[in-house]
Amino acid sequence: MTTTTTEVTFSTTTTGVGIITLNRPKALNSITNNMVTAMLQQLKQWQNDKATSVIVFKGSGEKGFCAGGDIKTLASAKEGDEQFNNAKQFFVDEYELDLLLANYSKPIVSLLNGVVMGGGVGLTQGTSHRIITQNTKWAMPEMNIAFFPDVGGVHFLNQAPGYTGMYLALTAKTIRAADILYIGAADFYVEDLRVLEQKIVDYDWTTVEEADHKLDELIGSLAAVPPRGELAALQNDIDDTFHLYSVEDIVAKLRDRGDAFGDEHANILLSKSPVSLKVTHKYMLDYAHRSLEDTLNMDVVVAMNFLRNNDFYEGVDAVLIKKHQSPNYDYPTLEEVDDELVDSYFKA
């Protein structure tokens, strides 16, 4: 059986597999509100369907699983109350979907090929079996558009080793296979997702009592070791600098090092929105031990406050629309972003 919308497709097999395919390859499968609504409805239906035992989650095309939310549409929120309310509804629904996927009662195999960023990470971070390849490019890149790592990012980035989560949140660095495994953002590395998907689809799940264990066995038979990554070797440098209690102190510490790591990363931070840096830094510290649900609830509050302020629209315009890379922020320096302003982003 196959159900199709223009942007996401759902199908089932006689072997007990439900398949979700994000279907906007020209937009790197970035998700729209229609897609989110459709997935919520279908996943709730499958949850109560005894004929469906395993979910496979993938993106169409060769370039990516999902590049995130449809940010250009969200950027229209400044045009009026209707657009603003539509943006809020998107966030509410998206975060509900993220929580449903993370708490789903059946195993979900996420095939993370190519670009997996932002909202794409949020969709799959809590799923039971996250599979990556040599082509996977993973990031929480929201800092690049004067936003913050939403979709529960503060929750799962805080679970990474040492201060790697803070590092990735503030720098928006893109990481590859070994580093994705290192921070706990994937479970298996395989050479060929097509072979794995075919094995899953061909296996008869209708007679299996513990599908999770059988999936571990099946995927494990194809698992490989990825090329060496970078984060483990940088762990001491990251912990030496990104543990500090203000963004200004982090930048100063990086500058004081007088080495390539310090210079590179000080410049990276100073290229970001000062508001985004400070709000994200505080959020990472204050919510380090909060649940995913608590974090997603706060994400709605923080996201809407970003949409009430101009710097987000400047960031989107500079990076995604006009692409001149020179945003004219209302708060262009860290010193201009005081604690009162930062605190206001956490108030509904």
Please report, for each region that a protein language model flagged, where it lies by residue:
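Glycine-rich beta-to-alpha active-site loop
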Residues: 101-145, 168, 172, 177, ...
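Conserved CoA-thioester-binding segment of acyl-CoA-metabolizing enzymes
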Residues: 1-58, 99
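Glycine- (often His-adjacent) and acidic-residue-rich active-site loop
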Residues: 59-93
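Contiguous mid-protein beta-loop-alpha structural module that forms a pocket-lining wall or clamp
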Residues: 152-210
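Hydrophobic/aromatic residues within transmembrane alpha-helices
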Residues: 57, 70, 123-124, 180, ...
